[in-house]
Curated annotation (Swiss-Prot):
PANTHER family reported in the protein's UniProt record: CHORISMATE SYNTHASE
A GO molecular-function descriptor: FMN binding
Signal peptide range: none
Disulfide feature: none
Protein name per the record: Chorismate synthase
Species name: Laribacter hongkongensis (strain HLHK9)
PROSITE patterns, alphabetized: CHORISMATE_SYNTHASE_1 (PS00787), CHORISMATE_SYNTHASE_2 (PS00788), CHORISMATE_SYNTHASE_3 (PS00789)
Subunit structure: Homotetramer.
Catalytic activity line of the entry: 5-O-(1-carboxyvinyl)-3-phosphoshikimate = chorismate + phosphate
Textual note on the cofactor: Reduced FMN (FMNH(2)).
Amino acid sequence: MSGNTFGHLFTVTSFGESHGPAIGCVVDGCPPGLAICEADIQRELDRRKPGTSRHVTQRREPDTVEILSGVFEGKTTGTPIALLIRNQDQRSKDYGNIADTFRPGHADYTYWHKYGIRDPRGGGRSSARETAVRVAAGAIAKKWLSERFGIVVRGHLTQIGDIDIPFTSWDLVDTNPFFAADTSRLDELEAYMDSIRKSCDSIGARLRVVAENVPVGWGEPVFDRLDADIAYAMMGINAVKGVEIGAGFGCVTQRGSEHGDELTPEGFVSNHAGGILGGISTGQHIEVSMAIKPTSSIARPRRSIDRQGQPVNMETHGRHDPCVGIRATPIAEAMLALVLIDHALRHRAQCGDVRVETPQIAGRVG
């Protein structure tokens, strides 16, 4: 299976399946000398791990990370960093009834036609379980970006179903199970998710992730544009079906006089571009939004076919997130950080000595 490596200079190669002994990744290209320990990575993993509330899968995985290589006396050595997370709460018997059928909305049908073999236990390689190692790798990227450039990458949920979640403060995001930046609608969200779960159904979500203090100049024009790589990274997250940069699809109703971000000596007047112009960072906040589809695994009878192409009615049992978007925020943060560190290293390699007389203006006026 190809397509398991992400990045150019800072690369992440992941491995493992949902119900295998372990999942893990190898991070290559990390600059030497970065102080990193398992606790730094564990903090990010704990934000994503399952079983943290009744609104997510009840699979109980501690997601304890082990650093196997690439770190000596608490610092990265510049050699490959191997990270391992052991699976401890698999319940493969829940998937015995789907070995010869294809779950609607899942990768079962496509994996079977592509490879001629598939692991039905928890979705195997296509499971969102794999994203834990992306969060682990992203923790390393986040720490380097923060220490080297003061970059902060953070996200929050903006919508579940038809419930919009306004933004009030970043300080609120990690105080509730929904990664919400406003707590005024928590009771409504709790009741809504309870009703979704009791009806044996699932629901979609929307989230936003922001990178602050990104310098101007990162990104490669044409094919490796910064926004193109960000969209590529986000679309590689399970269940993501749409990505917007800045105003995104909202630009359809904007006029050029409104959408174009004017520049003044004091700074940009707006940020409809989402911090990227011509595929290169502007120095403003990079703002990304994404739409996440409803969980495909639901305990409702649905039509499908078996391997022989015969019609079947099937229900998907097991432990599943009624809204996969709830736990997607740390994953999206990690993927944005991985894109940024890769472009930081690429920029340093080609254009690190470039200096111009024009000062970098503020990200936004007011």
